[in-house]
Amino acid sequence: MAYGQKILKGDAYKRAAIKRRHIRIRKNLSGTAERPRLVVTRSNRHIVAQVIDDIKGHTLASASTLDTSIRGGEADKSAQAKQVGALVAERAKAAGVEAVVFDRGGNQYAGRIAALADAAREAGLKF
């Protein structure tokens, strides 16, 4: 261990690992106007999906479990993630986006992340 390096335990260690993976992934990913980046951010309670044009630095479309159309519905988090995926795909298509680059945000491609991605694909987004 390097001098001055903190020893992380529990949830802090998990968050640090996710952050490291996200940095490593983002080195090779970038969204353009033709193919913006679909970013997925997951917490213990909520999931957020944003379609971002990295060149301009603008968010073109977004959806989350905090939206009123999703908030009161399903109790199952995977079902909520599917709804978020379908909603962000619908909003992205309304903004003129057909294809995206998927950024899983350092999370494993499983569970809620995979459910959101599959729902977005079924709704017509290509990635």
UniProtKB/Swiss-Prot annotation:
GO biological process: translation
Cellular component GO terms held in the UniProt record: cytosolic large ribosomal subunit
Gene Ontology MF annotations: 5S rRNA binding; structural constituent of ribosome
InterPro entries per UniProt: Ribosomal_uL18_bac-type, Ribosomal_uL18_bac/euk
Pfam families listed in its UniProt record: Ribosomal_L18p
Keyword Transcription regulation: no
Entry keywords, A to Z: Ribonucleoprotein, Ribosomal protein, RNA-binding, rRNA-binding
CDD domains per the UniProt record, alphabetical: Ribosomal_L18_L5e
Protein family: Belongs to the universal ribosomal protein uL18 family.
Protein task: This is one of the proteins that bind and probably mediate the attachment of the 5S RNA into the large ribosomal subunit, where it forms part of the central protuberance.
Subunit structure: Part of the 50S ribosomal subunit; part of the 5S rRNA/L5/L18/L25 subcomplex. Contacts the 5S and 23S rRNAs.
Protein name as annotated: Large ribosomal subunit protein uL18
Source organism of this protein record: Streptomyces coelicolor (strain ATCC BAA-471 / A3(2) / M145)
Gene name in the database record: rplR
